[in-house]
Swiss-Prot record:
The gene is lepA. This is Elongation factor 4. It catalyses: GTP + H2O = GDP + phosphate + H(+). Keywords: Cell inner membrane, Cell membrane, GTP-binding, Hydrolase, Membrane, Nucleotide-binding, Protein biosynthesis. GTP binds at residues 17-22, 134-137. It comes from the Bacteria. Required for accurate and efficient protein synthesis under certain stress conditions. May act as a fidelity factor of the translation reaction, by catalyzing a one-codon backward translocation of tRNAs on improperly translocated ribosomes. Back-translocation proceeds from a post-translocation (POST) complex to a pre-translocation (PRE) complex, thus giving elongation factor G a second chance to translocate the tRNAs correctly. Binds to ribosomes in a GTP-dependent manner. It is a peripheral membrane protein. GO terms for biological process: positive regulation of translation. Belongs to the TRAFAC class translation factor GTPase superfamily. Classic translation factor GTPase family. LepA subfamily.
């Protein structure tokens, strides 16, 4: 049991690639928390995909013992948070579990959009913030300019910013001293009823669900019965401990401490992130503020390329859902793609990570249908329905109006590319809310429809700015707009997997582009195939794929013209009949590329 005055809980805030996980590695190394033999790069990023993409997805934690220059022994608890916008809720609750943050900024790059988003969350959580300028060993490093930028853009004093190189280890000791002397100790009462915040949870095949907790008040011991305050479920605590980063059992956790508990919990869904844990008897009366269950934002269909792998896909998705409470799924069937699942995600990176994990860890090839968002469909009878899949759109005669989700996008971009970025946002039906300058960079704030962003906005933004722009967004609610469902018909048959929701002004251009793309991708058949884009009963774009034909008159030498005519008419009748009964095979690549179009 550590005295409160000797505990420091902190997180590291940074944009992707600014060196957050490397700094965490150095802090662990400097304090000999892990033996030199067990040390490896990005120690806290356990998933392969985290290491490979160089991003942190789950919040990870480590307890570091440190003897400061004043001779006192301190316990430092670091929570390494994700930096990406999709995992913003993981960030916000990790922030509430600690009292201070190290703001890591790459001294060659400066402040980026996700740095801003996460710093504002830290400020909202009343954190003390210590700025750290990283990568000072690089020749392009410019600490004075970046320190000035931190003061201009974020508005915190950066005159005493610590200059470090996480790669070489320079400045790490100063960072540890700053954590001890500048960050506040946690507050809490040992004798009060137990209040613990559930920071994260994940599934372990042997122990069941492991729950990461921050004790606010009271104490937690092995063998006690605990209650989750959001759903009232009761569990018996099997073991408690701390991470150094390996699990180490302890007898009790007291106020201000961060550790884990296991209680034979079967599913991650029973442990909701941000929930309050208390004792079953004589528990706390009120829960901690700020709990909200995470809601999926982007939906798409996942189908196996080989339909025999459907059961394997089901197993894979069920196992991933055990570990990820923000990932939802339900079965769906598609006439074109067979059996699969309709899945909900927090955002596009979350979608990519899950898809990559299924393909890599379970070795299943997938087709992903076009990502779509949740629309609100207001019916004539006054009811409101949520529309997850454009193929389920009700008949327009019963619909009063549609509303789509909007986001507030913050884009940081060098001046030279500002025009291109503004044009891209206008093209995506954006409404400009703000434009400010900080040094040679502009900060643009736009109100954009989420539907226009989920497709390929991020890729387009990176390409028009040569990769220099950074982008962050948050949901701001729903607004009515003139939206229609566009269907694609191949040989007069609607293809459900290609249905999308588009704005009426855009429908024609989008439909034409899709038809042209399909015309190139579908192989020619023995009969003529019309490819059409339609809204309701009205066709707005059409391409015709011409038939392969055999030269039936080749055998006729001279002779009577009626003989040739007869053969040609016979062929024509055959083609007509074939078109009525013929099935068009649409190859898998056609789906994938038609959905990837730049619209």
């Amino acid at each position: 049991m550590t005295e409160l005055s000797r505990i420091r809980n902190f997180s590291i805030v940074a944009h992707i690639d600014h060196g957050k996980s490397t700094l965490a590695d150095r802090l662990i190394q400097e304090t000999n928390t892990v033996s030199a033999r067990d040390m490896k790069e990005q120690l806290l990023d356990a998933m392969d995909i985290e290491r490979e993409r160089g991003i942190t997805i789950k919040a990870n934690t480590v307890r570091i013992d440190y003897t400061a220059d004043d001779g006192q022994d301190y316990v430092l608890n670091l929570i390494d948070t994700p930096g990406h916008v999709d995992f913003a809720y993981e960030v916000s609750r990790s922030m509430r579990a600690v009292e201070g943050s190290l703001l890591v900024v790459d001294s060659t790059q400066g402040v980026e959009a996700q740095t801003l988003a996460n710093v504002y969350q830290a400020i909202d959580a009343d954190h003390e913030i210590v700025p750290v300028l990283n990568k000072i060993d690089l020749p392009a490093s410019d600490c004075d300019r970046v320190a000035e930028q931190i003061e201009d853009v974020i508005g915190i004093d950066a005159s005493g910013a610590i200059r470090v190189s996480a790669k070489t280890g320079q400045g790490i000791h100063e960072t540890l001293e700053a954590i001890v002397h500048h960050l506040p100790a946690p507050k809490g009462t040992r004798d009060a009823p137990l209040k613990a915040m559930l920071v994260d949870s994940w599934y372990d095949a042997y122990l069941g669900v492991i729950v990461l907790v921050r004790i606010i008040d009271g104490t937690l011991r092995k063998g006690e019965r605990i209650k989750m305050m959001s759903n009232g479920t009761v569990h018996h605590v099997d073991r408690i401990g701390v991470f150094r980063p390996a699990m180490q059992p302890v007898d009790e956790l007291g106020p201000g401490e961060i550790g884990f508990l296991t209680a034979s919990i079967k599913q991650v869904r029973d442990t909701r992130v941000g929930d309050t844990i208390t004792h079953e008897k004589k528990g706390a009366e009120t829960a901690l503020p700020g709990f909200k269950p995470s809601q999926p934002v982007v939906f798409c269909g996942l189908f196996p390329v080989d339909s025999a792998e459907f059961e394997d896909l089901r197993d894979a998705i069920e196992k991933l859902a055990l570990n990820d409470a923000s990932f939802s799924y339900e079965m769906e069937t598609s006439a074109a793609l067979g059996f699969g699942f309709r899945c909900g995600f927090l955002g596009l990176l979350h979608l990519e990570v899950i898809r990559d994990r299924i393909e890599r860890e379970y070795d299943i090839e997938l087709i992903t249908t076009a990502p779509s968002v949740i629309y609100h469909v207001y019916m004539r009878d006054g009811t409101m329905r949520e529309l997850h899949n454009p193929a389920d759109m009700p008949d327009l005669t019963h619909v009063d109006h549609l509303e789509e989700p909007r986001i507030k996008a913050t884009i940081l971009v060098p001046d030279d590319y500002l025009g291109d970025v503004l044009k891209l946002c206008q093209d995506r039906r954006g409404i400009q809310m703000d434009l400010t300058y900080a040094g040679s960079r502009a900060m643009v704030v736009y109100d954009l429809p989420l539907n226009e962003v989920v497709f390929d906005f991020y890729d387009r933004l990176k390409s028009v700015t040569k990769g220099y722009a950074s982008f962050d967004y948050q949901m701001i609610g729903y607004r009515q707009d003139n939206l229609v469902k566009m269907q694609v018909l191949v040989n007069d048959e609607p293809v459900d997997a290609l249905s999308t929701m588009v704005h009426r002004d855009r429908a024609e251009a989008r439909g034409r582009a899709m038809c042209e793309k399909l015309k190139d991708l579908i192989p020619r058949h023995m009969f003529k195939i019309p490819i059409q884009a339609a809204i309701g009963g009205k066709v707005i774009a059409r391409e015709t794929l011409s038939a392969l034909r055999k030269d039936v008159t080749a055998k006729c030498y001279g002779g009577d013209a009626t003989r040739k005519r007869k053969l040609l008419d016979k062929q024509k009748a055959g083609k007509k009949k074939m078109r009525q009964f013929g099935k068009v095979d649409i190859p898998q690549e056609a789906f994938i590329s038609a959905l990837k179009m730049d619209g």
